[in-house]
Amino acid sequence: MAQYDAIVVGAGHNGLTAATVLAKNGLSVLCVEKNNWAGGMAATRELFDGFKHNVGAWALLVFRAEMIQRLELEKYGLELIRPRSSYCSFGEPEDTPLIGYTDTNEIMEHLAKDHGPGALEGLGGIYNFLQKYKELVDKELFKAPSSIDTLIAEAPDAETREILLKTVYGSAMDVLRQFFPDPKKHRCIQGSLCASAIDGTHTGPFTPGSGLSLAYHYTLGDAFDFRTPKGGIGALSQSIVKALEDHGGRVQYGAPVKRFCIDNGKITGVELRSGERITAEVVLSSLDARTTFLGLVGEDQLPSDFVYAVKDIEYQNGYIQIHMTLKELPEFTGHLAFANESNIRWIMAYIPSPEYLARCWEQYRHGQVPDEPVSYCAFPSVMDPSLAPAGYYTCTIFSHYFPYDVPPGKHKELSTVMAERAIDQIAKYAPNFRGAIMDKVVLTQQYFESTFGVTGGDFASGLIKPSQMWNRRPVPGYSDYSTPIGNLFMCGSACHPGPGITCIPGYNGAQAVLKKWKK
């Protein structure tokens, strides 16, 4: 007799969600986690004494509030902070910054007053444009997805089909130029919006297919509402842990899995690196597909065409995170001085234009550190003082396009170079910034690969691109969370709908298990 009804591998937010849903439905559940903490690539860690930093994800960018209700997370202590603005995206002094107010009326007033009626019309236009895609997302979100090509073909009219084709297969700028056509007047808005199109991808804003990532980021969650959990991003996972434990499940920390135990094509449990074997009726993996199938299952247990499909998944996702402690907040000057008067400076993003992003992309894809990196600079303790000692502050810079295939001997040198360049981008507009830094640590995709076991350090668990989304995620034929191995299921970001903190792949993976369990 198996020791558990279900074992979930990985205590990130998706793995924990799957475990909790199963436990709530009466199954005995064990979640095994490699590290000594929960959260995966959405954890809050004390990197420096007294300071808490969000390692990996830093806000709920594509989260839907309904998941809080489905998992009853407020009951287990989750409290969300809703900032006045999600970000302030800026460029050169002659460019008007874009402030991502979370209040609809406030952002409309800002666009009309500071950017002109054309910008306000443009925002309304792109919102209506993306609604066509969002209708598909909403219909397919909590189920095994259909083929996107089939959904496009079944669109009610030619105009909708054209919109969907451009969204899925066009570039981000193909979409944005329709609504913000002035390359000079609208370049800061264009740059800010198309920055989402390079997140979780291996593309630039003019690359065909980047429109899909743009649509993904602005339709999957609650747009313009970058909420953050009080206590750090890891507080979300901690609330799910409490829910899991309240329903009889538990997490076993410091328990990396060596291999899956398989008998006659059916999984029977897991073997930990310690040698301990744990049996279960079903196993769910929240890890990426390559780690799951090539690392834990083994090629010899799988059909050759399936192995080929897994090997074909792309994971090239280069980035750095710079976590810092500050003795004072930066004082922005000139055209950004207004940001010092409120918590608008919670996230300051230097993204002058889509052409600027494209230059970074060109250097990155040729293995070079961008001369002037894209830089998101967040000051989380401005919104949540519990993250830092009184009188001090936390700061994190996230920057895309750190070279992907860096020789081991050059990694530290190049990551240091890119970190300094990213800091310079902010210090250029806040002269006291560099002098305010007390401590810092630079993390790249290499750190996330070694610490969390995710292929290539790719936080998307498989890039956002047309050939790796919808019914092709994680691979064609297995978008229903099943696998070629009996009673082995997937439940992580490698599955539909995809990456980001959503809890939806975990929820859907658990539902697939329950559907079979009840038969």
Language model features with spans:
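Extreme N-terminal leader/targeting segments of oxidoreductases
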Residues: 1-6, 24-25, 469-471, 476, ...
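Active-site-proximal substrate-binding core of FAD-dependent oxidoreductases
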Residues: 262, 516-519
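Mid-domain catalytic core of redox enzymes
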Residues: 229, 258-388
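A conserved FAD-binding loop/helix module that cradles the flavin
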Residues: 493-514
